[in-house]
Structures are given as C-alpha cells and as structure tokens.
Regions:
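Start-transfer (signal-anchor) and selected internal transmembrane alpha helices
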Residues: 1-83, 355-368, 397-408
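Transmembrane-helix motifs of polytopic, lipid-linked glycan transferases
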Residues: 151-176, 346-347
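Intramembrane catalytic core of multi-pass membrane enzymes that act on lipidic substrates
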Residues: 70-155
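Membrane-interface alpha helices of multi-pass inner-membrane proteins
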Residues: 217, 226-251, 370-371
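Aromatic- and kink-enriched transmembrane "portal" helix at the membrane-lumen/periplasm boundary
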Residues: 138, 162, 166, 182-209, ...
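Perimembrane helix-loop-helix junctions
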Residues: 245-270
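Membrane-lumen/periplasm interface segments of specific transmembrane helices
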Residues: 19-23, 261-351, 357-372
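Specific aromatic-rich, kink-prone transmembrane helix
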Residues: 207-225
Length: 408
C-alpha cells in the first residue's frame, strides 16, 4: 500500500511548487519565490525516491466517476470561454511576440509541401528572420492552417492535455492529497486565463511543451521502452531543457542493466533526429549549433529593454546581473549535465551501499534537471517555469494509483 504520509507530503510540496510559480511571485516576492521554487523541486525529487514506486498500465478513463466527466466538461467550457476572450482582445501580432507568427509561417510551408523550405528566412517578420524552432515545437501548430482556427488553440489544447493526467488521478476527493492536487490544477487554470502577465495563452507556444513533458512522466512511469523513446524525442526536439539528463539517465539504466530500454530509446531518438534532418534539411540543427551564441547576445539586449523579465521572474538571472551573463550561461550549460549526473551518482551509491532500490529515479532526475535548467536560463520567461510544475504534479498524482497499477 502506498505510504500515505509520503503521498501527502508529495502533494503538499506539489501545491507549494504551484503556488511559488504563481501567487508566490506576488506575495513572497520574486527572489524568495525563485529560491523556494528550486528547493521545493529538490524536495519533491527526494520524496519521489522515498515514495511509492509508480507503476501503471494504459487503462485511462473515468470509470465509476461520473462527476469527473461533468466537472471536466464544465471546466473546459468555462476555460474555452475565457480563452476566447483573451484571443479576441489580443490579436496575434509579431510585434508583441514573434514565436507563434514564425511557427505559423513554418507550418504553412510544411502544409503546402515546401518541406525543404520550412527553415528559409521569413521576410515578412522583422524584415527577415531566420526560424530556429525544432520540429516537435512547430509541427503541432501546422494544424491551424487547414483547420482555419487561431493558432493559439493549439497552446490551449496542450495545457488541457497536460492537466488531464493529474485530474484523472483524482477519484472521490476523499483525501487531503487529492484536494491539494485539485487546488493546484485550479490555481494553474486561473493563472493561465486571468493573470495578465504570464501570457501563456495570449502569446506563447508552451502548451505543447507542457503536454510533451507530462507524456514523458507517464512514459517513464509505464516503463514502456517505445513510449519512453517517443516521449524523449518529442521533448528533446521541442525544448531541449532536459538534454543534460540523458547521459545521466543512460548511466542509471546501465546500472540497472536495462539493455533493451537503452537500445530502444537510442534507436527512436536517433531515428527522429536523422528523419528531421533528411526531411527539413541540415538547418533543423541550428538550435543546437548557432542559437547558443545568439542567446547570450539576446540576453544582453533584454536586460537593457525589458529588465523586469529578470527582476520579477523566478530565474536566477537577477543574481548574476547583465555584467555576468557569460558566467550564468556557463552555470546553465555545465550544470545541466553535472546536476543530473551527481543526482544519479548519489542514487547509485545509495542503492549499492544500502542494498535497497530507490523508486522513481528517472522521474525525479528529469524534474530536478528541468527545474535547474529553467532557473538558470539567461532569459527566463515566466511561462517556461510551468513545465516542471506540470511534470511534477503529474508524477505526484500518479503515486495515488501505484497500488492499483492503473488510472481510473
């Protein structure tokens, strides 16, 4: 039977994680909220190691819980109404944020059959801009053109796909843990729809990333090698925030002698990468080759034009300042590999010396890597910080059902 106390502590930490990324910025201040955000992520990761082992099959549904269907439908309708108001009030313009307009052009080129031209310069945006987004980031948005709808509905759909796992994990709200997760979901929905500065629905593409990383949490919990490979590929080829965790994951799987998992994941990831290069051309690799240098230059520009992104956000950039961007970038790059490696090294050492097996190491590893990476970004936009929150809430909610081996 799952450890009820650990499950409660996980849920409480998940609620605090959510609060720090939303209301905590206002009431605790950006500095305290940012430090607390990092600390709570570490606490969740450690609790996951000590908590019930997450095991599940793919029996998703709403069996025996008609209230789920009713409340889900009601919530989505209300959410749709609020999102529609946001989109009507703020037409999409590249002058406000160019991410989605760029992806719309990339998607239109793809739909029209100009696959090799997807990464050509876009002359109608900023008098010529080079698109650099990875395939799994922009491909979902290509559905907007044939569907003739606002591209931001893809972001909206991604948000709900990311929230569906923690929501379906709730049953009768008979425990404080379930109420804490439900409260976290409500806080996030309120924040995304009604708080004016996060811009998740109004301007960003981040909903698809939220969905990918929640899919990764489910895949890791399932232990299915093919699903893990697909999920890792989707995350790596959208926002590569957890790329530094891959060598550490490989080391842990080697320690556990999971040869089939290693070979399957490597095969799927390599297939997607090679396939992307063959279909879209070598420029698809620009985010890994050319973007890092431009990223530091962009950070210096943002410090001059919009310092509030750093000072009022959760990231650590406020402590480095504009004069130490290169130093912070070093912490970002090297730390993104070192932190997960040390985490895995500590886990393996514990297992070896104690003879006991830790639970959920892969999920805990991804969470701490994601949180560290986003906190150390030299340009730390607020909407990026909800990926670890949604990943963490999904992992925590899955512990509710570790005994039953399914979600009902």
């Amino acid at each position: 039977m799952p450890d009820i106390r650990t499950t409660f502590l996980l849920s409480l930490a998940g609620f605090l994680f959510t609060w720090l990324a939303t209301w905590g910025i206002i009431y605790a201040g950006a500095g305290m909220a940012g430090c607390g955000y990092l600390i709570v992520a570490l606490v969740i990761s450690v609790l996951l190691l000590r908590g019930p082992a997450i095991k599940l099959t793919f029996e998703f549904g709403i069996k025996g819980s008609p209230w789920k269907l009713l409340t889900l439908a009601t919530g989505m309708l209300f959410s749709y109404h609020l999102a529609r108001q946001v989109m009507d009030r703020f037409p999409l313009r590249y002058e406000d944020a160019d991410m989605l307009p760029i992806m719309r052009v990339m998607g239109n080129r793809f739909i029209s059959g100009d696959w090799r031209g997807v990464y050509d310069v876009i002359p109608e945006i900023w008098n010529g801009i080079q698109p650099v987004y990875l395939p799994f980031m922009w491909l979902p948005f290509s559905l907007a053109e044939p569907g003739d709808f606002d591209i931001r509905w893809i972001t909206f759909s991604g948000i709900w796909l990311a929230l569906i796992i923690p929501y379906l994990s709730l049953e009768k709200l008979a425990t404080p843990s379930e109420w804490l997760i439900l409260s976290s979901i409500i806080i996030l929905l309120w924040w995304f729809h009604l708080e004016p500065t996060n811009n998740v629905i109004k301007l960003t593409e981040e909903g698809v990333v939220y969905a990918y990383y929640v899919m990764l949490a489910v895949a890791l919990a399932s232990g299915n090698p093919l699903l893990i490979g697909i999920s890792v590929s989707a995350c790596l080829l959208s926002r590569y925030s957890f790329a530094g965790a891959l060598p550490a994951l490989g080391c842990y799987w080697l320690w556990r002698r999971r040869w089939r998992l290693i070979m399957t994941v490597m095969g799927v990831v390599v297939t997607f990468i090679i396939g992307s290069v063959l279909i879209f051309g070598p420029r698809v690799t620009m985010p890994f080759t050319e973007l890092p240098v431009k990223y530091v230059e962009h950070a210096a520009k943002v410090w001059i034009e919009n310092p509030e992104y750093f000072l009022n956000g959760l990231g650590m950039a406020k402590y480095f300042g504009p004069e130490h961007i290169q130093l912070q970038y070093g912490f970002l790059v090297y730390g993104s590999f070192l932190v997960p490696f040390l985490f895995v090294l500590a886990s393996i050492t514990y297992e070896w010396k104690s003879g006991k097996r830790l639970h959920n190491v892969e999920i805990a590893l991804v969470l701490i890597t994601l949180t560290y990476f986003n906190s150390m970004l030299v340009v730390s936009y607020l909407y990026l910080f909800y990926t670890p929150v949604l990943f963490g809430l999904s992992a925590i909610s899955l512990t509710f059902h570790s005994r039953r081996n399914s979600i009902r």
